[in-house]
């Protein structure tokens, strides 16, 4: 099918800790890489010990908004990047990431990449928006 990743615990579909563990096991049994969303610094800490490839830090209050996590929570991104790195995980950040500058700031703060949705889907030219964000990550 070409499926390579499983995105778990997004703020629009939060699941219990037991469901997270079961979902990770199910994904791993299918050789999928796992992206586990964390809504807080505490969750980043807790989830970094699990068998996942990526932790995606996305504060729910910023999702779909005009304020980027990269500019509003730089200290948490730095700390989350350190926690992830110490545990062999890569950090993604999302929430309000809409511009090349937002994406570049996330990487400079220690993130390996970004999660985007409304910033691309709702753009006048989604392809151009996506290309601009990708340019910042290369």
Features from the language model and the residues they span:
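Metal-centered catalytic cores of metalloenzymes
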Residues: 42, 75, 84-89, 104, ...
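Catalytic-face loop-and-helix region of soluble metabolic enzyme cores
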Residues: 59-62, 81, 89-96
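Short, well-ordered coil/turn segments that N-cap beta-strands
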Residues: 3-4, 30-34, 51-53, 87-91, ...
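Glycine-rich phosphate-binding active-site loops on the catalytic face of alpha/beta enzymes
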Residues: 1-17, 55-67, 109-130
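Alpha-helix-loop-beta-strand connector modules within alpha/beta enzyme cores
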Residues: 20-41, 71-91, 133-138
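Short, glycine/charged-enriched secondary-structure capping and boundary segments
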Residues: 20-23, 49-52, 69-72, 106-109, ...
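Conserved N-terminal beta1-alpha1 strand-loop-helix module at the mouth
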Residues: 34, 42-52, 121-122, 126-131
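Catalytic cores of alpha/beta
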Residues: 36-51, 93-114
């Amino acid at each position: 099918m070409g499926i390579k990743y499983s995105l778990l615990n997004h703020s629009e579909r939060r699941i219990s800790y037991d469901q997270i563990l079961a979902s990770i096991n199910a994904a791993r049994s299918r050789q999928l890489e796992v992206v586990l969303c964390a809504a807080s610094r505490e969750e980043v800490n807790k989830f970094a010990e699990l068998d996942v490839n990526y932790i995606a830090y996305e504060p729910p209050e910023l999702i779909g908004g005009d304020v980027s996590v990269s500019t509003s929570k730089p200290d948490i991104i730095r700390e989350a990047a350190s926690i992830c790195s110490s545990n062999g995980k890569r950090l993604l950040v999302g929430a309000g990431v809409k511009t090349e500058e937002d994406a570049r700031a996330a990487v400079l703060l220690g993130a390996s990449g970004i999660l985007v949705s409304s910033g691309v889907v709702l753009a006048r030219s989604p392809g151009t928006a996506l290309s601009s964000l990708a340019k910042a990550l290369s």
